[in-house]
């Protein structure tokens, strides 16, 4: 292929030389016949056009393949650069999509942790309240029992003192005022009244609680 191109190129160069030689021969012939004054301007213009066309043709032939190769090389380079940029764009888009997915997943995970912490806090709060309630009930019950025990002790002591005082008074006055039967009846009546009063006091205290 290169050999054929070289043959064609040399053929066009030879043709150009022949055209110029023919032009010179024509000019010499015109000078010999005495018509150089009329042929000279026409010859110059024709040769100028022919030389220009030959130059353009030679430049086109000489620069065709290099220019074609240059344009093809630039086209390939631009295509590769566009392909690289497209690949980078797709990679960047994929990275952005992955980042969005990770952010969404992290946000969901954070919400789950937050809800878990809130639920655990609620359970802990309820457990603390329940324990405090049980402890307060236990303390109240213990205090009530201590108060009730002390009240029983105080009531028993008061009753004993009251009985002793009453017996002392009765033992001093009854012999002087009433007989033995009346003394026994008065003592029984006193103890009956005391028991009734104690029963009423206990019932009233139970109702008030």
UniProtKB/Swiss-Prot annotation:
The keyword Transmembrane applies. The keyword Transport applies. The chain crosses the membrane at residues 9-29. It is found in: Cell inner membrane. It is a single-pass membrane protein. InterPro entries: ATP_synth_b/b'su_bac/chlpt, ATP_synthase_B_chain. One of its GO terms (cellular component) is plasma membrane. Keywords: ATP synthesis, Cell inner membrane, Cell membrane, CF(0), Hydrogen ion transport, Ion transport, Membrane, Transmembrane, Transmembrane helix, Transport. GO terms for molecular function: proton-transporting ATP synthase activity, rotational mechanism; proton-transporting ATPase activity, rotational mechanism. F-type ATPases have 2 components, F(1) - the catalytic core - and F(0) - the membrane proton channel. F(1) has five subunits: alpha(3), beta(3), gamma(1), delta(1), epsilon(1). F(0) has three main subunits: a(1), b(2) and c(10-14). The alpha and beta chains form an alternating ring which encloses part of the gamma chain. F(1) is attached to F(0) by a central stalk formed by the gamma and epsilon chains, while a peripheral stalk is formed by the delta and b chains. F(1)F(0) ATP synthase produces ATP from ADP in the presence of a proton or sodium gradient. F-type ATPases consist of two structural domains, F(1) containing the extramembraneous catalytic core and F(0) containing the membrane proton channel, linked together by a central stalk and a peripheral stalk. During catalysis, ATP synthesis in the catalytic domain of F(1) is coupled via a rotary mechanism of the central stalk subunits to proton translocation. Component of the F(0) channel, it forms part of the peripheral stalk, linking F(1) to F(0). Belongs to the ATPase B chain family. This is ATP synthase subunit b 2. It comes from Desulfosudis oleivorans (strain DSM 6200 / JCM 39069 / Hxd3).
């Amino acid at each position: 292929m290169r050999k054929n191109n070289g043959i064609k190129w040399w053929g066009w160069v030879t043709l150009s030389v022949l055209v110029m030689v023919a032009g010179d021969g024509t000019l010499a012939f015109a000078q010999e016949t005495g018509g150089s004054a009329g042929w000279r301007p026409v010859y110059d213009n024709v040769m100028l056009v022919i030389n220009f066309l030959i130059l353009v043709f030679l430049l086109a032939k000489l620069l065709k393949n290099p220019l074609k190769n240059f344009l093809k090389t630039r086209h390939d380079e631009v295509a590769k650069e566009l392909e690289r940029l497209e690949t980078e764009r797709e990679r960047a888009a994929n990275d952005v999509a992955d980042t969005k997915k990770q952010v969404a997943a992290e946000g969901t995970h954070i919400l789950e942790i937050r809800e878990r912490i809130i639920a655990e806090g609620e359970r802990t709060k309820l457990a603390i309240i329940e324990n405090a309630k049980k402890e307060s009930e236990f303390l109240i019950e213990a205090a009530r029992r201590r108060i009730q025990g002390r009240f029983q002790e105080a009531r028993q002591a008061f009753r004993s003192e009251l009985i002793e005082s009453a017996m002392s008074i009765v033992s001093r006055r009854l012999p002087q005022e009433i007989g033995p039967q009346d003394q026994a009846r008065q003592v029984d009546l006193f103890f009956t009244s005391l028991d009734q009063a104690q029963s009423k006091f206990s019932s009233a205290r139970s109702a008030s609680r």
